Curated annotation (Swiss-Prot):
Protein name: Envelope glycoprotein H
HAMAP family (UniProt xref): HSV_GH
Virion surface face of the membrane: 24-719
Post-translational modification: N-glycosylated, O-glycosylated, and sialylated.
Membrane association type: Single-pass type I membrane protein
Source species of the chain: Human cytomegalovirus (strain Merlin) (HHV-5)
Signal sequence coordinates: 1-23
Transmembrane intervals: 720-740
Any one annotated GO CC term: host cell endosome membrane
Region listing for Interaction with gL, in residue ranges: 217-280
InterPro entries: Herpes_gH (IPR003493), Herpes_glycoH_C (IPR035305), Herpes_glycoH_C_sf (IPR038172)
GN (gene name): gH
Amino acid sequence: MRPGLPSYLIILAVCLFSHLLSSRYGAEAVSEPLDKAFHLLLNTYGRPIRFLRENTTQCTYNSSLRNSTVVRENAISFNFFQSYNQYYVFHMPRCLFAGPLAEQFLNQVDLTETLERYQQRLNTYALVSKDLASYRSFSQQLKAQDSLGEQPTTVPPPIDLSIPHVWMPPQTTPHGWTESHTTSGLHRPHFNQTCILFDGHDLLFSTVTPCLHQGFYLIDELRYVKITLTEDFFVVTVSIDDDTPMLLIFGHLPRVLFKAPYQRDNFILRQTEKHELLVLVKKDQLNRHSYLKDPDFLDAALDFNYLDLSALLRNSFHRYAVDVLKSGRCQMLDRRTVEMAFAYALALFAAARQEEAGAQVSVPRALDRQAALLQIQEFMITCLSQTPPRTTLLLYPTAVDLAKRALWTPNQITDITSLVRLVYILSKQNQQHLIPQWALRQIADFALKLHKTHLASFLSAFARQELYLMGSLVHSMLVHTTERREIFIVETGLCSLAELSHFTQLLAHPHHEYLSDLYTPCSSSGRRDHSLERLTRLFPDATVPATVPAALSILSTMQPSTLETFPDLFCLPLGESFSALTVSEHVSYIVTNQYLIKGISYPVSTTVVGQSLIITQTDSQTKCELTRNMHTTHSITVALNISLENCAFCQSALLEYDDTQGVINIMYMHDSDDVLFALDPYNEVVVSSPRTHYLMLLKNGTVLEVTDVVVDATDSRLLMMSVYALSAIIGIYLLYRMLKTC
């Protein structure tokens, strides 16, 4: 509720109180009432006035002197120093100071403050005009809208890629459901707290308002970024040590009230058509926040229509986040991370304003926007929070309701990309129990399609975007383990040396629109064996590109901090080098250079002295158990030929290793087509070399050496395909002869 006239009178009274003279000289006087207040100029002649009921004094009133009673039962006096022996005296009705609200305000004013302390306080905080001198105003028109229109995905798919349609089982359509959804409240987080903001702050009166808090603690309790979101504004609090934190306050700010002698104008750093940015920082902290003096500080966040949520995410948050990630500034508090945190808070603020547009939005577009909001929250936690994170996740009940209702409506979610976002929203809102198995099955099939599409080509920006979302799903759910294991092995198989090399080249490009442009499947995969030291060993004669350390830094930042969603892998120490391969529903392989986990191990004998390679097979239903001791071992069988009959070699992994350097590449082969592709000599996946060997890790727990294998492609399926192809060729030839004779 906004304060009424009585509240504003109380605020006025408090402001007058804060001007109260701290010297020993005071006076009290009354005159004729003017709008329930009294105003006199009083001469004291160098003596204090005693506050007695019948005390009188000589007052100047209309250029004449007269004696007047200075005490009234229904009034409280305020005395302000004008000049030597002269004070301005105000009377305010006593009733304004009764009640808890008045008590709250009065408790925030130090009536015993000395003049010296008052003057010291004047010089404590930085003023924009004096200490920062970087004020800027922006005149762009602000309007809640969506520049992507009805585009169902942020990054559109390539023209030549067919997007699978979603099959949904027959269900009952909820009553009142429509194919479009109003934007009202859709992207507004639940305000589940009542906050007392600015409590105890030197400059601001506290205010009570519905809000939500979100904190990102970098190292300890002293280094953090906090976001406080209210209906009208947000606050970014930046703390570097135990001193008073810096505050960035942005929005519609009539309820942000300053204590005297300060005014809002003293602290306005940026100003737009509808909103203001206040910065409150102590002068002795300016050396740590010197970026506040930069004239382009926050330009990328405020110099366009930031109420356009899609444009804001692209032009502001993703721009800042990409810069932070490429420069390795996560877990640091500097200009880059502060701008990113501000852009994140601004995105939450703008998303809540979407309801002002009052427009209808399609379900796919609404799901994409909501998934984008949750994805930037996930990145903020990944980049800024300590491990394990303590950040409170924001809840979006209206968006969750939309996702649930869409699941009940046949043919409402038409393509797989919308289903990916719907499931992502439910998983990130702690609604895993609502995700049906058929939904994750189709998402896993989509991951396999991307895998097959990019077996012989680099990942597109669209594929990186989709794999980014699916990789997060894998590590944020406990249900539907079979489908999640399939997505996990796809991400692992796509994490090849070729992908890592291409990824480092991408980092050399100066412009990336979205965080997903910097995503590689290696971030969510089971490959934990990539390091600068290992790459240097693999390519001793090559010059390491300057972007390789940045690529490895991004991997370190983006990789999950645990594998706890997989029962047979959760105990693996993530600080050590290994590869985890979930090749099938029941079988996993862990490839290491030492004994690391309990299971059936296959020691590789064809390595040089001093090098070891151990492949351990585990059951997906067996609880992970860490061990450094030798345990059950089996020998590796040498295979000279492979038959594709019955797809016995499907759902397997092809592992390439070097005698001296260990694992080089791992390729996942889901079906017979993948096996043929891998073993076809024209594709140069398996290359004959005296130092290079190839192992096939099968879905039944068997490990084969296939370095010199011959593929028997006589299975019935391939034979039928050959017959069909030959028939098609003959048919085309006959058609050609007929047309030629006409």
